[in-house]
Curated annotation (Swiss-Prot):
Entry similarity comment: Belongs to the bacterial ribosomal protein bL28 family.
GO biological process, one term: translation
SUPFAM superfamilies: L28p-like (SSF143800)
Name under which the protein is recorded: Large ribosomal subunit protein bL28
One Gene Ontology term of the molecular function aspect: structural constituent of ribosome
Lineage: Bacteria, Pseudomonadati, Spirochaetota, Spirochaetia, Spirochaetales
One Pfam family matching this protein: Ribosomal_L28
GO-annotated cellular components: ribonucleoprotein complex; ribosome
Gene3D superfamilies associated with the record: Ribosomal protein L28/L24 (2.30.170.40)
Record has Nucleotide-binding as a keyword: no
Keyword field: Ribonucleoprotein, Ribosomal protein
Keyword Ribosomal protein: yes
InterPro entries cross-referenced by the UniProt entry: Ribosomal_bL28, Ribosomal_bL28/bL31-like_sf, Ribosomal_bL28_bact-type, Ribosomal_bL28_sf
């Protein structure tokens, strides 16, 4: 499976490493030398989590991001799925 949150759709992003070294010119240095940028990936913090659904009387396994897991613990799984326009039947 893809490295993607099944609820929020968060996935790996791409960007640059920007090394900032040296003292700024305003502070009397030679500058910060932001010349060499290298590509990098920002990976999602994914967790395989088992949730119990009392209406169905069974558990489901969902690959969810840590950020979504915090939100689920605050408002509950049903409310969070409703907010993100998802249905429990999609995960069975």
């Amino acid at each position: 499976m893809a490295r993607k949150c099944e609820i929020t759709g968060k996935k790996t992003m791409f960007g640059n490493n920007v090394p900032r070294k040296g003292l700024a010119k305003k502070k009397g240095g030679a500058g910060q030398h932001i010349g060499v940028k290298t590509k990098r990936t920002f990976k999602v913090n994914l967790i395989n989590k088992k949730f119990f659904i009392p209406e169905l009387g069974r558990s489901i396994n969902i690959k969810v991001s840590a950020n979504a897991l915090r939100s689920i613990s605050k408002v509950g799984l049903d409310a969070f799925l409703k907010k993100n326009c998802k249905k429990i039947e999609n995960f069975l």
